[in-house]
Regions:
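Short hydrophobic/aromatic beta-strand micro-patches
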Residues: 3-5, 81-83, 123-125
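PLP-dependent enzyme catalytic core of the Aspartate aminotransferase-like
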Residues: 90, 97-106, 112-145
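A short linear hydrophobic-aromatic micro-motif
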Residues: 59, 67-71, 105-110
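Conserved glycine-rich beta-strand-loop-beta hairpin in the small C-terminal domain of fold type I
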Residues: 30, 34, 50-59, 71-83
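A general structural signal for well-ordered alpha-helical segments in protein cores
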Residues: 11, 29-30, 91, 95, ...
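Conserved core segment of the aminotransferase class I/II
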Residues: 1-52, 61, 142
């Protein structure tokens, strides 16, 4: 989701590109999905292990940072909901601060409903080295907050 200020002809082009990206999977992606489904016994275990490694690293690291925490051990997907209540910030303000000062994108928990207030969501879809850098930045921001 986003906004664009541009002449009408550019907006129409951007809209067409966006619709193709969002609503239709390119044939190359469809073929990759078919291959992955047909070979899931080979493809899935290393992917599961890699995401498990990322999630456990992220959860352990978050719980070492002042004023934030996460339920441990993580279960399920590659998203973590980080408890930011101790910061005294709203989830929107916390997500904004983390983006502005740490240059790490999170989503405010209240985007997922009222019960998400007091949390931000982070995706652990990048490698552990990138996660380490992100959490180093977040830790610095939290210590200064």
């Amino acid at each position: 989701m986003g906004n664009i200020i541009a002449p009408d002809y550019i907006i129409k082009i951007v809209q067409q590109i966006n619709e193709n990206v969002v609503f239709t999977a390119p044939s190359m992606s469809q073929r990759a999905a078919i291959f992955a489904l047909q070979h899931r016994d080979e493809v899935q275990p290393p992917m599961i292990e890699e995401y498990r490694k990322r999630m456990f690293y992220a959860a352990e690291r978050i719980n070492e940072i002042p004023k934030i925490s996460v339920i441990y051990p993580p279960k399920g997907s590659f998203y973590l909901f980080i408890n930011i209540k101790e910061t005294g910030l709203s989830s929107v303000d916390a997500a904004d601060m983390i983006l502005r000062e740490a240059h790490v994108l999170t989503l405010p928990g209240n985007a997922f409903g009222e019960c998400g207030e007091g949390y931000v969501r982070i995706a652990c879809t990048v490698n552990v080295d990138t996660l380490k850098e992100a959490f180093d930045r977040i830790e610095k921001v939290m210590k200064e907050q």
